[in-house]
Amino acid sequence: MSTEHMEELNDQQIVRREKMAALREQGIDPFGKRFERTANSQELKDKYANLDKEQLHDKNETATIAGRLITKRGKGKVGFAHLQDREGQIQIYVRKDAVGEENYEIFKKADLGDFLGVEGEVMRTDMGELSIKATHITHLSKALRPLPEKFHGLTDVETIYRKRYLDLISNRESFERFVTRSKIISEIRRYLDQKGFLEVETPVLHNEAGGAAARPFITHHNAQNIDMVLRIATELHLKRLIVGGMERVYEIGRIFRNEGMDATHNPEFTSIEVYQAYADFQDIMDLTEGIIQHAAKSVKGDGPVNYQGTEIKINEPFKRVHMVDAIREITGVDFWQDMTLEEAKAIAAEKKVPVEKHYTEVGHIINAFFEEFVEETLIQPTFVYGHPVAVSPLAKKNPEDQRFTDRFELFIMTKEYGNAFTELNDPIDQLSRFEAQAKAKELGDDEATGIDYDYIEALEYGMPPTGGLGIGIDRLCMLLTDTTTIRDVLLFPTMK
C-alpha cells in the first residue's frame, strides 16, 4: 500500500487494515472462504417461536449461522452481538470460556460490518430474546470501511441512491421494499405462465425507434458503422413473433427513453409487454385487471391497497369509461360531435388548452383536453378507452367510429399504469400511420417515430387479430410499496 494512499485513510480505516494484517499473521484469510449454514435468522425464529427459555435449554439444539456484525457490546470475558442476514437479525452470545481464548479474540477484535460465522446452542436470554450461544466463531470477511454513523437508518438521500448497498445494510424497510418488488415481478410471471404465455427476449439495440412515442438514446455500432437506438418499447418485435405463430408472448425488460426525470420517470425503467392472438382490447382489459389484482394480492393480501393515505379499491372491478365521455363529464365539451380542426382549436383556446405546432388533427386536441382536465381526477383504477387515431399509430380503428381506436390506458392515482389496444394488423393502414408519424417528427414532435419498413413487411405476411398490453413495472411497484418516487423502487436509479 502506497504512503500516498495511507494518508487518505482516516483513523478507523487504518486500524481496520492493521486488523486485516493481524488476521493474516494468524493464518486467517481476512476475506474468508465457503461457510455452510444450517439456518438463517428467520428460520430459527420460526422454528423456536413457541419454546421458552427452559424448553430450549432442555432440547439442547445447535445451529450454524452467518451474517454481518451490526451491533456489539460487552467487555471482559462475555459479549453480545447481532448478526444480520437476508432475512433479518439474530443475537449471538459469546463467552470466552465457551469458545476458548484464541477464538474469543477473533470476536473481540471484530469490527461492525465484518462478516462472521457462528456455531452454537440455540437459547433464550432472560429477556426472552432468541440467541445463539457460540461454541465457535469463524471470521468470514473484513470490512475495511466503517458503516455510516447512525447506520440504523441511513437518511442522506444522495447516499441512499448512489450507494444502495449502504441503504440495504442500514434500512430494513428499504431492503424489504426490494424483496417485494422481486415478488411482484415473479407473481406476474407466474400469472402469465399459467395462462399459457411464453416469456421471450427481443433486441435492446434497434435500427429504428418504434412501438412508443418517445425520444430514444442514440448509439453507434462501430463494426457495422451504423447508428442504432436503445429500445423505447418491445412492441414491434413481439408482434413479429405473433406473425411467426407464437400466439401468446410477453417480455419483462428494460426500456430506455431519453427524456426528463421526475418522481415517476427514470431514463431506464422496466416494463412488461404482453400480446395475445385472437383477442381484442376488451380481452386485454380483463387480462390487465387480472395481472394487477394478482400482483397486489400476492404482496398485500385481499382487500384494498392504501397508497399515501388513500384507499385504492384494487380488489374491485376497475371502472371503464370512453375518453370522450370522460372529457364531456368534466368540461361539458362534446367531442362526439363532428368538427373541423379549426373549430377544435377554437374550443381549445376558449378553455385555455395549449395547442402545439404538430397538432394537425382533431384527435390531437381531444387528447390534449384529456391530459389537461381528466387525468388529475382519476384516483381509483380506471380504464380510459377510445383514444383518437391521431395519437394511437399502432392501434386498430374502432369499427363503429373510425375517428377513434380500440385502445385503453389504465389510470390509478392520476398516473398511467398501462397502455393497450387491439393491434393494427393492416399493413397498408399501418404504413400510412407511420408516414403521419414521420411528418409529425419533421414538424418538431420529438416523440414521433420514423417508419419501420421491416415491420410493415412482417405484417404483409399476415398477423391474426391481436390484443396487446404494456405495463410500467416500476409504477406498479411504487403503488404496492406505498412509495412516492421511482428512485425508491429502482436499486440503482440514474443520478447526475
UniProtKB/Swiss-Prot annotation:
Matching InterPro entries: Aa-tRNA-synt_II, aa-tRNA-synth_II, aa-tRNA-synth_II/BPL/LPL, Lys-tRNA-ligase_II, Lys-tRNA-ligase_II_bac/euk, Lys-tRNA-ligase_II_N, Lys-tRNA-synth_II_C, NA-bd_OB-fold
Highest taxon, organism lineage: Bacteria
GO cellular component: cytosol
Compartment annotation: Cytoplasm
Binding site for Mg(2+) 2: 416
EC number assigned by the record: 6.1.1.6
Biological process (GO), any one: lysyl-tRNA aminoacylation
Cofactor(s) in the UniProt record: Mg(2+)
Principal location listed in the UniProt entry: cytoplasm
UniProtKB keywords: Aminoacyl-tRNA synthetase, ATP-binding, Cytoplasm, Ligase, Magnesium, Metal-binding, Nucleotide-binding, Protein biosynthesis
Reaction catalyzed: tRNA(Lys) + L-lysine + ATP = L-lysyl-tRNA(Lys) + AMP + diphosphate
GO molecular function list: ATP binding; catalytic activity, acting on a protein; lysine-tRNA ligase activity; magnesium ion binding; transferase activity; tRNA binding
Pfam families attached to this UniProt entry: tRNA-synt_2, tRNA_anti-codon
Gene3D superfamilies assigned: Bira Bifunctional Protein, Domain 2 (3.30.930.10), Nucleic acid-binding proteins (2.40.50.140)
Cofactor remark from the record: Binds 3 Mg(2+) ions per subunit.
HAMAP family, A to Z: Lys_tRNA_synth_class2 (MF_00252)
Quaternary context: Homodimer.
Name under which the protein is recorded: Lysine--tRNA ligase
Native organism taxonomy: Bacteria, Bacillati, Bacillota, Bacilli, Lactobacillales
